[in-house]
Regions:
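Short catalytic/metal-binding and nucleic-acid-binding patches
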Residues: 1-191
Length: 191
């Protein structure tokens, strides 16, 4: 159990520049491998797709790793702020995961429990704070960010070829349609 007074509150600085892609990274609480199972990964992919439709943003690349997620998104409207996108992605996954753990693996909840000084208790799925957020303001940088995202499972030794990792957009960029989530292919500067 973690006491809230023992935790330094992390804050993500966000610059919601209209017409600017965002490279986002966020992690599981205490870097626990909470995204190692297909069930939880599918919840995340479902949440990505729902948030994309709700907040009107393009998803150019993603990868789901066992304890963190990388995204490259492009907001199509001023309403698609980073805070809204992240809440729309993270909240449904956390709620489903905590409910599932309560019903099936309650011992795991202890690792995710945080007690506030007031005595209020909560269970964390995601690391506190928003994670990493960078505006990608140069079009020439976008393909490099996509490649970096796709190579995560290769660098970790989970696969030898990026497109072999099913929880990534790498296979989509190779032209495969049998993917977990179809992304909005980056084909140069947005119109």
């Amino acid at each position: 159990m973690l006491r809230q007074t023992d935790v330094h509150r992390k804050r993500r600085r966000s610059f919601d520049a209209v017409g600017c892609p965002h490279e986002l990274t966020f992690s599981c609480h205490r870097r626990l491998r909470l995204l190692r199972g297909d069930r939880t990964r599918q919840w995340l992919v479902d949440a990505l797709d729902a948030a994309r439709r709700r907040w009107n943003f393009e998803m150019w690349a993603y990868v789901v790793m066992p304890e963190h997620v990388h995204l490259l998104v492009y907001p199509r409207s001023p309403d698609a702020t980073v805070a809204r996108m992240l809440k729309g992605i993270k909240q449904p996954v956390a709620r489903r995961a905590v409910a599932w753990l309560r019903a099936h693996r309650p011992v795991w909840l202890e690792r995710q429990r945080v007690v506030w000084p007031t005595g209020r208790e909560e269970f964390r799925f995601w690391a506190q704070g928003g994670g990493y957020d960078r505006n990608v303001d140069r079009p020439a940088t976008v393909p490099k960010v996509i490649e970096y995202i796709h190579q995560n499972p290769v660098r970790r030794g989970l696969v030898t070829v990026a497109s072999a990792w099913p929880w990534s957009s790498a296979a989509w960029y190779e032209g495969r349609v049998d993917v977990k989530l179809r992304v909005d292919t980056y084909a140069g500067e947005p119109t």
